[in-house]
Design a protein with these regions (language model features):
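Cell-envelope and extracellular/periplasmic
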Residues: 64-68, 148, 159-160, 174, ...
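Serine-hydrolase catalytic machinery in alpha/beta-hydrolase-like enzymes
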Residues: 33, 39-42, 56-136
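Loop/turn elements at helix/coil->beta-strand transitions in domains of secreted/extracellular proteins
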Residues: 57-60, 88-93, 139-142, 164-168, ...
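A domain-start/cap signature at the N-terminus of enzymes
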Residues: 20-60, 91, 121, 150-153, ...
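Bacterial N-terminal signal peptides
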Residues: 9-18
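Primarily recognizes the serine-hydrolase "nucleophile elbow" in alpha/beta-hydrolase
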Residues: 134-135, 141-187
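The feature captures the conserved acid-bearing segment of alpha/beta-hydrolase catalytic domains
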Residues: 168-244
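Bacterial N-terminal signal peptides that target proteins for export
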Residues: 1-9
């Protein structure tokens, strides 16, 4: 089944924890950074265009990957899985890459690492968003961040600190509960938290993050499923539907509907 295929693919990735694409440095001597199923936008940045949603809106998802080891081609598993989801659910997915540190590619989760690495990360994401819109020839109606595993811990911090100008977050298999708003008047983008209840490593962290959002009176939704350390496609579908609903409702659209 399709649900099982994405689950198995991303579980494997976690455990290891525009013309034609050209090779990007860092993918290995004989491997480009971007897989055949996605397109290279710039060095270590890929994308897949799944087209508009069923109602014609253009959705951009910025995907913050789970831990990647430096083995050439290892990143392809997550790229391919999200590219399939983009086609199935009608969105464009942008794949930035975290900094390369001692043991692989990880997003910064400590305050010290964020202070050192975050300015370049955020600037790179903003450049890539603009370049992608130019490449495709259209702007996006809504932009959401999806963070998985290492990317979930970082995305949760970005959300609470309102560090990116986006319309919502989907945080899967992880979450940091220590971050606090830097500006009480900053935009509070809604957050969907998917708790992988069968993952002993992250379930408690995800629940704690949801508790932090509740204490902050943040717009959020939390859902638990008996799944392990993976990007569950049910979480992704539910989170995307909810965020799309929130965005349409915020625009006062009569067709917002309930997710």
């Amino acid at each position: 089944m399709r649900s099982r295929s994405i689950a198995v693919a991303l579980a494997v990735a976690a455990l290891g924890l525009v013309a034609a694409p050209r090779p990007a440095t860092g993918g290995g001597a004989d491997k480009p950074w971007c897989s055949d199923e996605v397109v290279e936008l710039s060095d270590h940045v890929c994308y897949a265009d799944g087209g508009p949603s069923p109602n014609g809106r253009r959705t951009l998802i910025v995907y913050l990957h789970g831990m990647l080891v430096a083995t050439p081609g290892f990143q392809y598993v997550q790229q391919r899985a999200l590219a399939r989801e983009a086609k199935a659910r009608g969105f464009t997915v942008l794949f930035p890459t975290s900094p390369l540190v001692k043991d692989g590619y990880f997003w910064p989760t400590s305050a010290a690492a964020q202070k050192e690495q975050e300015p370049a990360i955020l600037a790179g994401i903003e450049r890539s968003r603009a370049a992608l819109a130019e490449r495709l020839g259209h702007p996006f109606d809504e932009t959401f961040v999806v963070g998985f595993s290492s990317g979930a811990y970082y995305a949760s911090s970005l959300a609470v600190r309102s560090a990116l100008d986006v319309d919502g977050y989907i945080v899967l298999a992880g979450g940091s509960s220590w971050a606090r708003p830097a500006d009480a008047n900053a935009k509070r983008a809604p957050v969907y938290v998917g708790v992988s209840a069968s993952d002993g490593q992250t379930a408690t962290h995800s629940r704690s993050f949801a508790g932090t959002l509740a204490a902050l009176h943040w717009p959020y939704r939390v859902e638990e499923r008996p799944v392990g350390h993976l990007v569950d496609d049910v979480f992704l579908a539910h989170g995307l539907a909810w965020l799309r609903y929130r965005k349409r409702a915020s625009e006062g659209r009569s067709d917002a509907g309930a997710p």
